[in-house]
Amino acid sequence: MIQELKADLNGKGQKHCVIVSRFNEFITENLLKGALESFRMHGVREEDVTVVRVPGAYEMPVVVAKVAASKKYNSIVCLGAVIRGATAHFDFVAGESAKIGSIGVQHSIPVVFGVLTTDTIEQAIERAGTKAGNKGAEAAATAVEMVNLLSLL
């Protein structure tokens, strides 16, 4: 018989670190609000969530590495908004910030990528709590589930 592992969304007793970009703060604050509400809804106590603010998405990898190495948290959630402009800056920042996943693999900790990469401000707004839901809330729920899944392995 095939064994299937399925994690629940009960975050009781979990500790999470949320790293949030100050750049495009009008978007990232809504992502953060969504994440914090999602953690609360899934049983994570407010005092078990630490928020770290970084200047932008480009600065996230070094902070993720430091937090992961500390072994203080069960997961790391990264929130930001990189919006395409007329230069190659978008591609560079989006590419660098996407490297955070490898840090999670190195440290065996879930690192959830909640950094929006959109073509327009409107798309970012939609993903930060309007038409397309709140990707910050989704990232927090993913973190809770991944912590539980890893505990089953």
From Swiss-Prot:
Q: In which pathway does it act?
A: Cofactor biosynthesis; riboflavin biosynthesis; riboflavin from 2-hydroxy-3-oxobutyl phosphate and 5-amino-6-(D-ribitylamino)uracil: step 1/2
GO MF annotations, alphabetized = 6,7-dimethyl-8-ribityllumazine synthase activity
Cite the EC number: 2.5.1.78
Q: Which residues form the active site?
A: 89
| Protein family per UniProt | Belongs to the DMRL synthase family.
Lineage runs: Bacteria, Pseudomonadati, Spirochaetota, Spirochaetia, Leptospirales
What protein name does the entry list? 6,7-dimethyl-8-ribityllumazine synthase
**Gene Ontology cellular component list:** cytosol; riboflavin synthase complex
Keyword list (alphabetical) reads: Riboflavin biosynthesis, Transferase
Residue numbers binding 5-amino-6-(D-ribitylamino)uracil: 23, 57-59, 81-83, 113
